[in-house]
Amino acid sequence: MPDFKIVVSDPKTKEDKKEKLKVKVSDKVKSNQGEKEGKAIPLARINDKIKQALNLDDFLTLEITKQEGDKKVKIKGHFKIEVDNTVPDGEVWISKSMAEKFGAEEFEALAYRTRAFQLSLDQSKLPNLVGTKIGDVIDINVSGVNLKLKITGGSDNSGFSMRFDVGGGAKRKILVSGPPGYYPKEDGLRRKRTVRGNMITPEIVQINTIMIR
C-alpha cells in the first residue's frame, strides 16, 4: 500500500517577509523519526521577536542554495516552530538530523513563513482518511503535531486528478471544460478526460489540503 503524499498549503500566507538567520544545532530540539524523509514534521526554536518580524504563525521555512557541480541547488526545510526566548536574536535552533539534510551543523539560511509543505504518510496509519471527500475537514496528528486540514483535491497512482463535481471514488471518462484534468488552450473548448471522483480511496496517492484555523 503506497504512502499518502499530503500537500498542506497555508492560505493565509500572502506576502513573504524574509530574513537571513544563523541556523545552529541544539540538543534542546528533539529529532522526530522520519523528519528528513518528510514522514514527520521537524521542530525549530526561535525567539518571539523573530516570530513577529517574519509574521509567523505555526510554520517556518529555511532555505539555502548550494553549489553542486556546475549548478546551484536549493535545499528547503519546513519546520513547526517553538517559541523559546533563550534563543539569541538572529538565530534559529534545529535538530541534528535536520542539519544533516542541509549538510552542516551551523550555517546561514533564508527564513520565511511556510507557504506549503508535503508529508509522506503510511496509509495504514490514517484509516479514517479513506472515504472522506473533497471539501471535508480532517484532523491528523503527525509526530505530536495536530493539523486541521480541508481536502481540496488530489490524484491517483496513474496521475488522474480528483474532481469535486464527480461523485464516488472510481475513475470515469467525462466531458470537461477546465481544470482539474484539462487545461484548454482556448475558452469554450471541451474534451473527454479520465478523472477520479471526489472520494479518497487507497488508489489515491496525493491529497491536496489547506490548513484550517
UniProtKB/Swiss-Prot annotation:
Keywords: Ribonucleoprotein, Ribosomal protein. InterPro entries: Ribosomal_eS6, Ribosomal_eS6_arc. It comes from the Archaea. One of its GO terms (molecular function) is structural constituent of ribosome. It holds the Pfam family Ribosomal_S6e. HAMAP family: Ribosomal_eS6 (MF_00512). This is Small ribosomal subunit protein eS6. The gene is rps6e.
